[in-house]
C-alpha cells in the first residue's frame, strides 16, 4: 500500500498543483493522500473525482505532517531533486510492504530529510513534483498501475479519434432522463415500483447496485416510443444515443419476461439475436419487472397465471426458473422479501 504525504500546501497558491498531485497519486496506484494544511475545497474536489470515476482512494487534509511521518509503520520516501537516483534504490524500496511518499510544495524542512528512510530523486534537475510522483509510482509498479481498471459513474472509452464517455446515471439523473423523453405518470410509477423490488433483491443478492438501480428506473424508457414487444430494443437505442453505460443498455434490452430467445425474436419480427438476461444485474431487473403489474407488486403464482392464460407456457417456465434461481441466491423466496413493500 502506498500513501502520499503532501506538505507545505498553501491553499491560496497550490490548490491546482496539489489537486494534480492527488489525481496522479490515485491514477498511478497510491491508495491515499494526506495533506498538511486544511483545505475542504480540495478534499471535496478529489472526493468528487473518486465518486465519479471509481476506486477507493482516500484524501484527508489538516494533518500534522511530522508526527504522521514519524508514526508511519513502513518505508518512508522523500521525493527530492537532492536525493539519490531512483534507479539505485527502487528495488530496496519495493521490498517493503507499506510505503509513505513525501511530496513537498514549498521548501521541505530538513526534518523530513532526516525522518525519511530514503531521499530519492527522479532527476537532479529542477522539475515538477507531479512528474516526480508519477515517475516514482510508475517505477515502483513497473507500469502495471496503468492496467488497473475502475468502475465509476463515468467511464472513458479509449478512442483512436475523438472522445467518448459512458455514464452510469444515479437515481435523480435517471428520472431526469425519463422526463426528457416525456415519460408519463404511468411509466414513472411503474419503474419506481420496479426499482423498489429490484433494490430489495439487491439487498440479498451480490450485485452492482448502481447498475440495478439505473436499469430498473430506465428499463421501460422505450415505452415513450412504443408499447409493443420491441419497446426494450427502442429503450436500448435511446440510451445508446445518450452514452449510457453499455451494461445498463443491455439490462434494458434484455428485460422482457425472462428474456427472448433468438428463435422467438425471429417469430416476433425483432432483430434476430438472444435477448436473454445473462448477468446477475440483468436477471434482477428483468424479474423485478415481472413481479410488478402496472405499479402493483404481484407474486409468482399471479405472474405464472397471467402467462399461462396467454398460452405462453415456455416463457412461463423460464420465468419460474429465473425466480427459483434468484431466490436460491438470496436464500429466501423472492415473494417473501417483496411482500412488505
Curated annotation (Swiss-Prot):
Binding locations of S-adenosyl-L-methionine: 79, 104-108
PANTHER family attached to this UniProt entry: TRNA (CYTIDINE(56)-2'-O)-METHYLTRANSFERASE
GO CC aspect terms: cytoplasm
Oligomeric and partner information: Homodimer.
Entries under Pfam families matching the protein: HD, Trm56
Keywords: Cytoplasm, Methyltransferase, S-adenosyl-L-methionine, Transferase, tRNA processing
Taxonomy of the source species: Archaea, Methanobacteriati, Thermoplasmatota, Thermoplasmata, Thermoplasmatales
EC number: 2.1.1.206
Enzymatic reactions: cytidine(56) in tRNA + S-adenosyl-L-methionine = 2'-O-methylcytidine(56) in tRNA + S-adenosyl-L-homocysteine + H(+)
Lineage: superkingdom: Archaea
Keyword S-adenosyl-L-methionine part of the UniProt annotation: yes
Protein name: tRNA (cytidine(56)-2'-O)-methyltransferase
